[in-house]
Each structure stands twice: as structure tokens, then as C-alpha cells.
């Protein structure tokens, strides 16, 4: 059951699965708040100041319980918010219901179609006679929609040749919008002060735009805050990957041979999680530095094509395109589990499997029969497995990430004149502040430098303690 509640614009006030889930969602939000000390500290610090008063934020990020705490923090700090999920499978319907019940516009339900996904992304950008002035993005879809739509206003032929199902839905949604408002995208784009981007893939898009000198507004790269990438990407994946695989399949991980493709922070956490439950873990990498790191951690570094027939569990974590191809898929052993923990769904060539028999076992779990007669288990249709088949990262680690997001929104909204159309990272002292806000919760006690010690290493007693070049 999908419920929408219309207001006096062409955009409904919310689109969710079931408003009756709001009480359940509220109970889980209350629990999550106790595990998100960073966000709660920002509420206390800025409650009276309201540094986001006047901010109109279009949010495109997984609509989970943890995100609900983020949304309500933004609102408590003065912002107006409209929200959609950045993945068709990642919404927790009770979280969306709780946000809708509070009167915050939200457009998200688990299991959206691609057409619905792009419609909802349009909804967060459409404020009627008003306009959003900030974007909070995860993967760059909201930002990318404005940029592509603006191009289509001038030359509709950019929408002529979609290369996949996703682009077909995206291009169709832009054409439909242009039929009723031919200047929608450029008008909204001109009102955007800036964007804060959550994830590796979205940040890569922003840097590409910067390189092409086509970034339309300033951007803060939240992903590369140390307290995001070295915590969310690493420790979050270390817990949520195996959670999702076990919820989806009930498989015994101990003794299985697993291949993690990509050994960045996400891959490192994924490999640790599988090894922690007794899997024999191998790693595939293109980067010699990451490959050497994997080898020094005791993982076998292999080529996919050399081991594909021997692997029980495949995990892609690269942010790249078709790292598991049709040629790899058809060689897989019977009952091999195939999943992705990178942001987009194109790391695995799922489209090539469409011609083979599919049997849906349960939501986001499919049995696919290969020409060899072997069956593989595909999770979340190749999309983010930890949010498609489970509930994503734990609240505590997401508090790190989302505290960075709130600080980035405050910084960009209040100091826009200091930022050019480039990509920035938050300064080191804010990164350290985020870490400080989370220490008490886990009983950690900081040692304090003496003045003499601080002078000896040429830092302030209060920090920052490391140079911008330090890699942690």
C-alpha cells in the first residue's frame, strides 16, 4: 500500500508505503539517537542558534532509521527539508513513515521502480514557486539530475540514446518534466548554494565535473573526511556486509572461499568481516598499493578470471563498471553467492543475466540458472547488498558520517561567499571535533599534550594534531 498526502502543489507532501508504521519507526529512531552522540551533540550546541535557518535542503540519501536522525537534526537546526532515497531497495519503510508523520516531506519506499525513483528525485527538487538552495547527496544523483536536465533544456538530443534501464527511466523523467516546465532544471540549479556529497562514487563524479570546469556550484566532499571514510566505509562495512549475506541466505560463512574485488576502505572492511567469520578470503585489485596492503594483511591477491570457478562468495567493492562480466558469471560454481557493496548496480553485469531463468526466492534474493546448469544466488539485483538485504551500517558509525554532513551543510550555507565552484573537504579541526564527540560513548579517554610536547611537534595543545597530508 503506497500512501501519498497531497498539498497545494503538483508535488505530494509525502509518498511512502504505510503511515501506520510510524510508531514503530519512532521507537527505533529513539534507540538510534542513543547511539548517535555526534548528531545529538550538534542539536544541543546549535539548538538556539539555528545555523540552518533559511536552508532549503533537497536530500537524496538512503531513507533509514539513522538517516531519520540526520533529517530531524537538520530540521532542529532550522532547515526545511525534502527527502528521497538514493537507492530503490534501501528505504526502511517504518523510518520513512516516522518522518512523514512529523510533517517532513519524504518520498521513499522499499522496492521502488526506476520510474518512481526518478520521480521522487524530482520531487525533492520541486518546491513549487520556491526552490531548494542546498543539496545533500549520496552518489550524486540529485546533482547529476540538475546538470543533465539543464543540458537537455538546450539540446534534447542528449536524451536520445539511453544505454541501460536506469538511463531509460532517467531520460524519460526529464522529458516529462520539460514538457510542463522547460526551464525547471536551470532555474533550480541557479538557486543552489552548494552540495555536500556522502559517498566515494558521488565524490568521483564531482571531481570529474571540476576537472571539466563544469561544476555548477561549490561542493564539500564529506566522504574523504577521515571520520567518514575510515569509519563508515571500513568499520561500517565490516559489520553490515556479513549481516546482509546471512539475512539473505542463512549460509554458513566459515569455511567458504570468498573473493573481495577492490581493497579500498570498503573492501578492507568487507574482507575483515568475512575473515572474522572464518571464510578463506582472497582479494582482486588493480592498484598495486592496495594489492600490497592486502598481501601484507595475509590475503591471497588473485585475478578474478583465475579463480572464478572456485569462489563461494563474490563481493564487489570497487565503484567501477562491470568488474564481474558475463564471461565471469557463466563460469561460477553451483550456488555461488554474488553481491555488491559499492554504490551503483553496474559493478556486476546483471543485464547479461536477464536472458537466463530467474527464480525469486524472497525480496532481493534471486536464483539464476546459468547455461551450465549451475545456479547462482544474486543479492539485491547487484545493488547495495547491505541496504538491500539488511539495514545498512550501525547507528554509531553513521553518527560519524552524518555529523560531518551537518557540519558541511552549516559551513557551506553560512560561508558560501568563501567557496568557489570547486570541491572541498572539511578542515582538520572539524574532523577531530567529530571524533571527540564520539569518544565518551565508548568510554575512551584522551591523553592531553603538555605545552612543551605540543611545541616539540609543532602543534597546538588543542589540535589539529596531524597535517593535511597524514593518511591515518
From Swiss-Prot:
Recorded family membership? Belongs to the adenosylhomocysteinase family.
Main location, first listed in the record = cytoplasm
- Per the UniProt entry, the Enzyme Commission number(s) are 3.13.2.1
Single GO cellular component term: cytosol
* Cofactor(s) required, per the database record: NAD(+)
Can you say where in the cell this protein is located?
Cytoplasm
Alphabetized PROSITE patterns for the sequence: ADOHCYASE_1, ADOHCYASE_2
Alphabetized UniProt keyword annotations = Cytoplasm, Hydrolase, NAD, One-carbon metabolism
* Cofactor details (free text): Binds 1 NAD(+) per subunit.
Q: Is Cytoplasm given among the entry's keywords?
A: yes
Zinc recorded as keyword: no
Catalytic reactions of this protein: S-adenosyl-L-homocysteine + H2O = L-homocysteine + adenosine
The protein's name is Adenosylhomocysteinase
The pathway that the record names for this protein is: Amino-acid biosynthesis; L-homocysteine biosynthesis; L-homocysteine from S-adenosyl-L-homocysteine: step 1/1
Biological process according to GO: L-homocysteine biosynthetic process; one-carbon metabolic process; S-adenosylmethionine cycle
The GO molecular function terms of this record are: adenosylhomocysteinase activity
Task: Identify the PANTHER family for this entry.
Answer: ADENOSYLHOMOCYSTEINASE (PTHR23420:SF0)
Q: What does this protein do?
A: May play a key role in the regulation of the intracellular concentration of adenosylhomocysteine.
Q: Which residues bind NAD(+)?
A: 199-201, 233, 262-267, 285, 320, 341-343, 386
Give residues annotated as binding substrate. Answer: 64, 138, 198, 228, 232
Q: What EC class is this?
A: hydrolase
May I ask which residue range the UniProt record assigns to the signal sequence? none
